[in-house]
Amino acid sequence: MKKWAIGFAVLGGFVGANAVTWNPVCETNGHTLVLSSDHFEICRKAKYDDGSTNNVGVSRDEAQKGLDILESVFVFYHDSLQWMLPQPGDPDNKLKVAVYVFDDEKMGALYGGDNTEACNEAGCSPGIWLGKGSLSDRSGLAHEYAHGMQSLTGWMGNNSHTGWVCESHANWMMHQFIPNEAPGCSEYLIDFPFLYYGSTRDRYCNWHFMEHLKEEFGGGIEGVKEVNRIWTESIKDGEAGRMEQTPFSAMMMVYDWTLDSLNQQFGKFAMKQATLEYTPAKKKLYKKAWGDYEFSTRRSVGVGYPYSNHARITMMNKIPCPDQAPGEGVEEECPDQYITPSYWAPQRWGYNLVRIYPDKAGKVTVKFRGIVQDKPTVKGYTCFGDNEDDYLGKKYKWCNYAPDALPDPASGWTVGLVAEGSDGTPRYSEMKHGKGFNLEIETKDNDKALWLAVTATPTEMQTIMWDQFYYSIYRYPYMIEVVNGTPEGYNKDFWKPANTSGYKQHSNGGGWVSNKASVASTVFVGPNAVVNGGTLTGKARIEDFAVVDGGTVSGNAVLRGRAFMSAGSVSDDAVLEEDAWLVSGSISGNAKVGALSVIFESTIKDDAEVYGVMWPLEYKTISGTAQLRGDLENNFSKEISKGIFYGMVDDGMLNNANYGANLTTPPTEATASLDLARWYAVADDSTDLDSSTTAIGLLQQVRPMGTSEPKLYFDKKEQAVFIRYKKNGREFRYRVTGRKN
């Protein structure tokens, strides 16, 4: 795949740190100087912002430790990386960076940003504010000083567009400073890769794409310098266009990229994520820090945040065969085709990894069909936002939560296959961009895994704002068909217990039931369902690929889809469905839990519903008619009994109509329903006939709906003549002559 050729420019405005005079700030502004170094001052203000007295005591050793860390950060950021110095407008005289120290009880965290008191103007000097315990926090100081430097560029734009990148980039800079550590939350992007890139939900933890760009630009110090150009060479404070600037438009401007160039980079990034294909040292570090993609890992406590690994790899849903049309000859089965669950489909520049299990070594072909959405489902929503700007005489009010207008979806995907060799080295297929196409790759008997990497790459820029509600953001679902392979979950005996000793097939449904479980004869256990433990009574139903490891299921409760139950209880008429997981707690009444929800020590009852795609719901009670949906960040402590909430939810939102407190039905989603999705032919189909097949008449490209003209062909392997045609977007073939094996 093509590597982007980018010239390495020396950053404008950089002057060696030792060539200038660094002047004090702390005592000049009436504060108490604790200790000073070449470029920093540990400073104690007399009062907190609330007017109370700041009595913090800082020993010389504590202050010196903080200064030593900060000076090492300074040398790395400025001397090694040549990031611009503070007060970029004055190359000869600089101000020391003030580090304001407070008592830990009043300020337990660290903050970095613009210190306007240093030079009586914004964008002049960085500052750091912290509790004294943070003076020894190496990673925290590196992160906050990066914020201080970002402030000198005007934060790249307004918070609605760029707030997330400030946190992401600061953690990435911290990672450059401490390269043998992966910042603590960095597995979040691995856990929830389908969220749009730049999501507010994982803003501290989604810096992986910057590491990818660093390596695209040659790696090492030069690669870091190239990434930092988006801060130093993008539209500056005071220049026209800054309010509309996003980190992505900045990249396109600085690197002279088109949207297609950016889309290709995100496609390459997703393929790289399949094997974490960074430099050898980073690959080893990341695999140790983030764990693997195995199904057993995803259904365990996992790594990082507990029970958050289960959504890493997308599992497809099989498309039911349509009603077969009458015709002469022997009717053949319809092709095995699969569709993404809507909740698992990637948002803009999010990606899915789908594991493919080859039937045998050799060529595997994946037929990819994006589900094209031509227009929004709604024109927009009632504008709701909390960010405003006044810039160059113009006032900006951002609808950052609920946009009042939606762009066209501009459906597009960038897709590739990655075969992971026996030694972990990847082999890549061609990477394709568009709506529908076929991909192929050669596999080997000793390959570790085969991955399909699907990135949502719309053909028009999609700008998503800070905390924008989940329902207003497009997802980009798709369908696949695999030749010589099967998506995970549909390969032979995937759900069957590895050792059926101690199991029997249940009399009511035929599913596998362990002798460690107690299952009443009135309970239905479907043929693909498994009960490894627990007590199941009444008219409960365990359907599809649902698995019960423990707990109690009673009444008319239903588990279906790929629902997983470790413990707890599901009772009455409650439903656990789709890819939801009950780790512990209870679901009762008419409650429903689905999508990618994880329930841990929580109570879901009455008519409540939880359909989340992100964080586990822990120690919560959801009752009445309340609903939680989408990219949940559950920061509330009170019981919720009404309303429908998305995204970050805290106690202050529970009675606020703007956040959903008065909703009784979910808002219309921007993403169209999958009900009308139909398979369709593409130009690649005419070149994908098996070598044992001789074409007599090739299928023409057909509309997604309707029936194509029948064509005859002779299959050498089958020694038979078939009629092939398309109906309702699906392919059918009928045997006219020859043997039937």
What name fits each language-model region?
Residues 487-552, 562, 566-567:
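Extended, small-residue-rich solenoid/repeat segments and analogous flexible loops
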Residues 116-121, 135-140, 155-218, 228-273, ...:
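Acidic/His/Gly-enriched intrinsically disordered linker/tail segments
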Residues 20-125, 129-145, 149-153, 400-426, ...:
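Zn2+-dependent metallopeptidase catalytic core
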Residues 713, 717-737:
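Short, surface-exposed terminal/edge motifs of secreted or surface/virion proteins that either
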Residues 674-716:
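Extracellular/surface-exposed low-complexity repeats and stalk/linker segments enriched in Gly/Pro
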Residues 237-494:
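Beta/coil-rich, acidic/histidine-enriched accessory regions frequently appended to metallopeptidases
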Residues 1-18:
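Gram-negative bacterial Sec-dependent N-terminal signal peptides
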Residues 556, 562-564, 575, 579, ...:
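Predominantly polar beta-repeat domains that present long G/T/S/D/N-rich surfaces used to bind, process
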